[in-house]
Amino acid sequence: CNINNLIFKLMKYVSKNKFLVLFSTLLLTALVLGSFVKKGDEVEVIMTTSKGELILKLYNQTPIHRDNFLKLINNQFYNGISFHRVIKNFMAQAGDPNSRDPEYTGSLGNNSEGETLPAEIYPSLFHKKGALAAARMGDQVNPEKRSSGSQFYIVQGKKYNRNQLTQMEARINQQLEGNLVGIFLKDSSNREYMNRVKVCQQNGWMDSLNVVIGEIKNMVLKDVDKFTFSEEQLKAYETVGGTPFLDNGYTVFGEVVSGIDIIDSICTSPTLPGDKPK
């Protein structure tokens, strides 16, 4: 059973008037990108899968990702694209052009259309159930958190209690510290600190290494606020669920406004090795 092929339509609800403009499958005109995307209005797209239809709202707060997504729809890029990775209680991912080919035997998830996009990460846009977010390469090779040009995922996630969320905050802050220290050490102007770190590591001087890392943290964290979940996030993760451990790491640029049950159906589908749906 092929659950994966995506078809997109564009729909636009003009605020208050409930006026619906429905465009043909995978057809998005320049008029929509220019005149119809107004302050206070948001574009919605219909995603059709063999499991049913979802309506996705695209955030104006993330215009780079919104416009790129609409451009791909306009160019019919998503014709025949499949969800190549689905994980129960986590998410469903799509956007690899190789997923169009049912005979493709290579690893999916390594290819995208176009250039990477600069991150548009905001605390108010988070990974609640139904969030639409951009996939990306990991921090080690992508410290700027730039997004894939075409790959996205939709969150299923699960519910968390307050204690679990508190522990998650601590882990996210540890990751943030590590990323900032890594960026600092890669900067050629900080070669002296990198040399000190290497000497400590080579000689097993852990106490001295901790002192150096402490000095670096004091510099890179002095103007950085610690990550904390807002009350809105806490309430959402406790009641509807999501993937809070991804917050502050990936660009969330939209959400499911209708058809959330379709994501549940996709994410609980039987899979092959590599989390590829059958």
Model regions and ranges:
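Bacterial Sec-dependent N-terminal signal peptides
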Residues: 1-41
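Cyclophilin-like peptidyl-prolyl cis-trans isomerases
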Residues: 13-15, 31-278
